[in-house]
């Protein structure tokens, strides 16, 4: 179990461009900041961009009794409003929202720093030297750092939080 989890952590932060890793997903997104606009974030799958107009139309046609609100499509004003609020959290709170507002690219530096955290590097170094390439251990070389289960848990937690942030706050998709 420990070998499998630690090898997985190493793979998730692999910077080799051919690897399917959280690091490379982040880098692919960071290379195309022009796609990270408010309009694409909010309305990419058919949600209304101008939720106020849809809300106003809904209130005019409202009847007495229990109603269900659309959560997808052009009538989902509430979902659209929440998407605007989520976008505000990653681009700042502009006094007037504009379709071409962009996500603050400084967020990528923060996420990269999380994926390069010393505890993750400690786990990766241990895996490289004791699991993946144990035959290369130099008996006269420096001691191999040993990661504890707490280190592994913290490393995995950091990676999961970065992936969750990418999934929800950058790609506007539900997390895992």
Map each language-model feature to its residues:
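Amphipathic alpha-helical interface segments
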Residues: 1-118, 144-176
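Histidine-centered, metal-coordinating catalytic motifs and their short helical/loop contexts
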Residues: 115-140
């Amino acid at each position: 179990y420990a070998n499998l989890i630690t090898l997985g952590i190493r793979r998730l932060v692999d910077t080799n461009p051919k690897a399917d890793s959280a690091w490379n997903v982040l880098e692919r997104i960071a290379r195309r900041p022009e796609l990270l606009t408010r309009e694409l974030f909010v309305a990419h799958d058919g949600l209304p961009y101008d939720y106020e107009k849809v809300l106003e139309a809904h209130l005019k046609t409202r009847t007495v009794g229990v109603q269900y609100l659309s959560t997808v499509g052009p009538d989902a004003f509430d979902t659209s409003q929440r998407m605007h609020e989520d976008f505000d959290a990653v681009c700042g709170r502009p006094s007037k929202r504009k379709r071409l507002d962009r996500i603050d690219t400084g967020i990528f530096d923060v996420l990269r720093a999380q994926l390069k955290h010393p505890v993750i590097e400690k786990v990766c170094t241990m895996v490289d030297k004791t699991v993946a390439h144990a035959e290369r251990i130099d008996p006269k070389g420096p001691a191999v750092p040993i990661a504890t289960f707490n280190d592994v848990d913290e490393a995995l937690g950091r990676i999961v939080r970065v992936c969750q942030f990418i999934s929800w706050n950058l790609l506007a998709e539900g997390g895992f």
